[in-house]
């Protein structure tokens, strides 16, 4: 418990493999809305639209790509 990131790989520059905590200055370690340890800006498409659905976009506050509520 208390893990902030997946510490399986010491190669991840955002995550301290010894503590499973984000490195200083890192906002995230992985996820569709995480790029180089930082949250991708709000409104960036993280999952393109399919059919009549709208694009899923990053919130700017999380590494996760939220599902569009209008699916």
From Swiss-Prot:
Reported tissue expression: Expressed by the venom gland.
Domain (Disintegrin): residue spans on this chain: 1-71
MF term (GO), any: toxin activity
Record's function text: Inhibits ADP- (IC(50)=56 nM) and collagen-induced (IC(50)=49 nM) aggregation of human platelets. In vitro, inhibits adhesion of endothelial cells to vitronectin, type-I collagen and, to a lower degree, fibronectin and laminin.
Keyword Secreted: yes
Single GO cellular component term: extracellular region
UniProt-listed GO biological process terms: venom-mediated suppression of platelet aggregation
Cell attachment site, short sequence motif: residues: 50-52
Compartments where located: Secreted
Main location: secreted
The protein, known as: Disintegrin simusmin
Disulfide bonds listed in the record: 5-20, 7-15, 14-37, 28-34, 33-58, 46-65
SUPFAM superfamilies, sorted: Blood coagulation inhibitor (disintegrin)
Note: The disintegrin belongs to the medium disintegrin subfamily.
Quaternary structure and interacting proteins, as annotated: Monomer.
Record keywords, A-Z: Cell adhesion impairing toxin, Disulfide bond, Hemostasis impairing toxin, Platelet aggregation inhibiting toxin, Secreted, Toxin
UniProt record similarity statement: Belongs to the venom metalloproteinase (M12B) family. P-II subfamily. P-IIa sub-subfamily.
Keyword check for Secreted: yes
Domain of life of the organism encoding this protein: Eukaryota
């Amino acid at each position: 418990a208390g893990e902030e990131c997946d510490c399986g790989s010491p190669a991840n520059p955002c995550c301290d493999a010894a503590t499973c905590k984000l490195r200083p200055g890192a906002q995230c370690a992985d996820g569709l809305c995480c790029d180089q340890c930082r949250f991708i800006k709000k409104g960036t498409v993280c999952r393109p639209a399919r059919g009549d659905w709208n694009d899923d976009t990053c919130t700017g506050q999380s590494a996760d790509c939220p599902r569009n509520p209008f699916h």
